Curated annotation (Swiss-Prot):
Region span, Disordered: 86-133
Top-level taxon: Eukaryota
Compositionally biased spans, kind Basic residues: 86-95
One GO term of the biological process aspect: translation
GO molecular function per UniProt: mRNA binding; structural constituent of ribosome
Cellular-component GO terms for this entry: cytosolic small ribosomal subunit; Golgi apparatus; plasmodesma
Taxonomic lineage from the root: Eukaryota, Viridiplantae, Streptophyta, Embryophyta, Tracheophyta
Keywords assigned by UniProt, alphabetized: Ribonucleoprotein, Ribosomal protein
Family per similarity comment: Belongs to the eukaryotic ribosomal protein eS26 family.
Compositional bias ranges of the Low complexity kind: 113-133
Name of the protein: Small ribosomal subunit protein eS26z
Presence of the UniProt keyword Secreted in the record: no
UniProt cross-references to Pfam families, sorted A to Z: Ribosomal_S26e
Length: 133
């Protein structure tokens, strides 16, 4: 019989049984070695309020604490929330991690911002602009 993945979708090599965990999203029981695990590190304070909190702080140069959370997803929730993506048959064999997305540069103007030319009108724009009688 053909096989889809070299590891059978699990990380259980030479172990008979692995204890289950609960999915962080739906609560489904899933083997710990099969679950998709992500460690999330983010600021406790949201980006918009960081400056206000630092100005109100008594201590100079106080670094705000971070929030550390380990999330474990079942396969269906990880695919649904785009934590992992479905790959083609040939790309399933690729073991290198996917490239990280580079942050957008702040100096590039965004569409619709001042200083940018308006977008060209489409074919229906002339009909919509004409006055109705």
């Amino acid at each position: 019989m053909t096989f889809k993945r070299r590891n059978g979708g699990r990380n259980k090599h030479n172990r008979g049984h692995v204890n289950p965990i609960r999915c962080s999203n739906c609560g489904k029981c899933c083997p710990k070695d099969k679950a998709i695990k992500r460690f999330i590190v983010r600021n406790i304070v949201e980006q918009a309020a960081i400056r206000d909190v630092q100005e109100a702080s008594v201590y100079e140069g106080y670094t705000l604490p971070k929030l550390y959370a380990k999330t474990q997803y079942c396969v269906s929730c990880a695919i649904h929330s785009h934590v992992v993506r479905v790959r083609s048959r040939t790309n399933r064999r690729v073991r290198t991690p996917p490239p990280r997305f580079a942050r957008r540069k702040e100096d590039t103007p965004k569409p619709g911002q001042p200083g940018q030319a308006p977008r060209p009108a489409g074919p229906g724009a002339a009909a919509a602009a004409a006055p109705r009688v």
